[in-house]
Amino acid sequence: MAATKASTATDEPVKRTATKSPAASASGAKTGAKRTAAKSASGSPPAKRATKPAARSVKPASAPQDTTTSTIPKRKTRAAAKSAAAKAPSARGHATKPRAPKDAQHEAATDPEDALDSVEELDAEPDLDVEPGEDLDLDAADLNLDDLEDDVAPDADDDLDSGDDEDHEDLEAEAAVAPGQTADDDEEIAEPTEKDKASGDFVWDEDESEALRQARKDAELTASADSVRAYLKQIGKVALLNAEEEVELAKRIEAGLYATQLMTELSERGEKLPAAQRRDMMWICRDGDRAKNHLLEANLRLVVSLAKRYTGRGMAFLDLIQEGNLGLIRAVEKFDYTKGYKFSTYATWWIRQAITRAMADQARTIRIPVHMVEVINKLGRIQRELLQDLGREPTPEELAKEMDITPEKVLEIQQYAREPISLDQTIGDEGDSQLGDFIEDSEAVVAVDAVSFTLLQDQLQSVLDTLSEREAGVVRLRFGLTDGQPRTLDEIGQVYGVTRERIRQIESKTMSKLRHPSRSQVLRDYLD
């Protein structure tokens, strides 16, 4: 029976003859088992070839001699597979764990005829992953098992014997379900259910809740500081620029702005540039944007240094920085490098202008016009200077003299400068009282007066019930007892369809009845 094997010198198959002698049969069976393990180590499935039914007849004399195959232990078969995998690295660039299928090992150990036929089938298709020119020693069966156990992980036997795909699928299914179950368990532990709360098993720790509230309050207070710290750390990564670098970036920005303007004008006129020229113009525009961003990022620290001067005036520090950044963008767009000044000198004025304008528009609860804000700032500056010179608070006349305005105008400006405060503002170190608790409400109704007024209404109603319907109606409309709005005689006459004189007569007659002691006595107590 002939089998083919790839030659080490050439890729052409070379035929060789497999004899059926007893020694060759035993060697062939052993070689077949080792090649089966080697094929498993290289990643190809040898079990299909090893389990094929024997299609050729085998001589009876060679069968008893093949029982030497059954004396090969499983561990030695695995050791041979490990050695073969180490000597024959895969040409495909990947390596897998040595794994011998159970079916191939079982047939190699129990059926010599099938093992011999497996050797013939493997020899017929020599597709072992061996590098050309490299010899694979398949007869090296005497390996040191102690050394092999040191090299292989303790669970190598389990890996070699785990060829059942169903076990792997079960493990994968369990692994897929485990994270979800763990998450559910965590949620149940972290968040007590409504049933637990209702049953009384869940006990709320007051000390812990107070600590959490205090920690949350501290976090809110430090949130702004943390944001500023993170922002300063981020902008500090950009290196500062020298004068030459600023001029170079300014030239690139100018070229980008010019290219953008030119393309916009051509687009408005409906003209189209050639593809190559349009591509160059687009590149110049993008380069100008990159230079603009670089110049901006390198001067963000200038904005922070200027914004520090305006803290404590009604705007948060981060808001001042953002408004200053808008002024910095404006300065980058209008910077003229031909003047010979540094960019920071020019940008400072734009940053200050943006910050002061934002404070005038956003810092106050009630917005004040920008020109009045400038007057208020000037008055405050003069007031501080006079305080240092005189050692006392200046009078309105002294302020008016310095500002060249009237004292009345100074008082008016000082009224505008006042800022409203919240009635919910806390008072004291403990913060348990609010400002509104100490301010009297002059329009609030006193409880005693409210009760007295209610009793007076009841007494008036009882007295008016003793009069006729027209008389009681005229009195109610004349004195506004119903809605608090008194009516004239003409208005009452229009209501009843009579003249104003008739309404006057009814009023006079009704008042005489009300002055009778039987009616007026119950109302005299409310005159005090």
Curated annotation (Swiss-Prot):
PANTHER family: RNA POLYMERASE PRINCIPAL SIGMA FACTOR HRDA, RNA POLYMERASE SIGMA FACTOR RPO
Compartment(s) where it occurs, according to its Swiss-Prot or TrEMBL record: Cytoplasm
Gene giving rise to this polypeptide: sigA
Note: Was identified as a high-confidence drug target.
CDD domains, per database record: Sigma70_r4
Family: Belongs to the sigma-70 factor family. RpoD/SigA subfamily.
Region named Sigma-70 factor domain-3: 374-450
UniProt-listed GO biological process terms: DNA-templated transcription initiation; response to water
Organism: Mycobacterium tuberculosis (strain ATCC 25618 / H37Rv)
Protein name, as recorded: RNA polymerase sigma factor SigA
Biased composition (Acidic residues): 110-173
Biased composition (Low complexity): 19-31, 38-56, 80-92
Intervals of motif Interaction with polymerase core subunit RpoC: 319-322
